[in-house]
Regions:
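A generic structural motif
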Residues: 211-221
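Short, acidic/turn-prone active-site loops that include or flank metal/cofactor-
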Residues: 163-168, 189-190, 217-219
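Metal-dependent DNA phosphodiester-chemistry modules and their immediately adjacent helices/loops
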Residues: 220-256
C-alpha cells in the first residue's frame, strides 16, 4: 500500500563497482530482468577531508567505514541493459561512495540525481551489516539504509538494512536472527513512506516478535532518520532511553511507539 511495495532491482541504467584502493576492477552490473549481469568498471580513491566530514557529521569514523567495507569511488563505468555505455565521476560537489560485499558493490551518490547504482548480484538476499553482527546480542535495529547502519554502528548499536525500506524483509533472515538477539526493532524513517513500511513490516514479522520504534522527528527531508537524529546532537543514551521507554510501556506483538 502507498509507497511500501516490493522493490525490484534497478534497471541496467544503474550499475556499480568495487576494487582495492587506487585500483580498477572489472566485475558485473545488475540488470533488472536478465540473470546475466552487465560488465562494469570502478576505481577507488582515498577519502577526501570533505568526504570524511560528510560521514563524520553523524559520528561515522574511518574505522567504521573500513569495517563495513565502505569506500570512496573516483569513477564508475558500466552499460545499460541495451548495451549503451555510461559512467559517473566523483567531484567535490557530487561525491561517490561504494558499499562493498561479496556479491559486488552498491554505489551511493548522496548529492546526485541518480543516488544508487548496483554492481553485481544483489538479489533478494541483500543485507548490509549482516557479516559484522556478533554471534549473540541484546538489541538489533533493522533500518532503511546503509548510512543509518553506519551511524548506529558508530554509536555502539548493532544494525542491518535490506535494499530499501520498501523491500520485502526475508523471513528466513529474521528467523535466524531471533535466536541471536533478544530484541529486534524496526527503526525506519519518520516520513509517510517510512511509517507505512515499518508498520507493514512489523505486522508481517509479528510472529518473530519484531518491534517498531518511531523516532521523535517531524519526517521532513532534513529530519526523518536516525542519522538526522544524531546529527541534531542526540546521544546514544537518548536513543537507548527511547527504546527502554517503549519496552517498559508496551509488550507483546503490539509493542510499538
Amino acid at each position: 500500500t502507498g509507497g511500501c511495495r516490493r522493490l525490484r532491482l534497478v534497471p541496467g541504467a544503474r550499475g556499480g563497482g568495487a576494487g582495492e584502493a587506487g585500483t580498477d576492477t572489472e566485475e558485473a552490473a545488475v540488470s533488472a530482468d536478465r540473470p546475466e549481469p552487465k560488465p562494469y568498471r570502478a576505481a577507488e580513491k582515498p577519502f577526501t577531508e570533505g568526504e570524511l566530514a560528510y560521514w563524520g557529521a553523524s559520528g561515522i569514523t574511518v574505522e567504521v567505514l573500513r569495517r563495513y567495507g565502505t569506500v570512496s569511488l573516483a569513477e564508475y563505468r558500466g552499460e545499460t541493459r541495451e548495451g549503451k555505455a555510461f559512467g559517473f565521476s566523483s567531484t567535490p560537489a557530487e561525491p561517490m561512495f561504494g558499499y562493498r560485499g561479496k556479491w559486488g558493490v552498491k554505489v551511493y551518490r548522496p548529492m546526485s540525481e541518480v543516488r544508487f547504482v548496483y554492481g553485481g548480484h544483489t538479489g533478494d538476499n541483500y543485507c548490509f551489516g549482516l557479516e559484522q553482527l556478533p554471534s549473540k546480542g541484546d538489541l538489533l535495529f533493522l533500518t532503511g539504509g546503509e548510512k543509518d547502519v553506519l551511524t548506529l554502528a558508530a554509536h555502539g548499536f548493532h544494525a542491518i538494512c535490506f535494499n530499501s525500506e520498501t523491500s520485502v524483509i526475508p523471513a528466513k533472515t529474521v528467523r535466524k536472527l531471533v535466536y541471536r538477539f533478544k530484541h529486534i526493532v524496526l527503526l525506519y524513517d519518520t516520513d509517510k513512506t517510512g511509517l507505512e513500511c515499518s508498520e507493514k513490516h512489523r505486522a508481517q514479522l509479528a510472529e518473530y516478535g519484531v518491534k517498531r520504534l518511531v523516532l521523535p522527528l517531524p519526517g521532513t527531508k532534513a529530519e526523518k532518520d536516525v542519522t538526522d537524529y544524531f546529527k541534531a546532537g542526540h546521544t546514544r543514551e537518548e536513543l537507548m532511553g527511547l527504546f527502554l521507554s517503549c519496552s517498559t510501556r508496551c509488550t507483546g506483538t503490539r509493542w510499538r511507539c
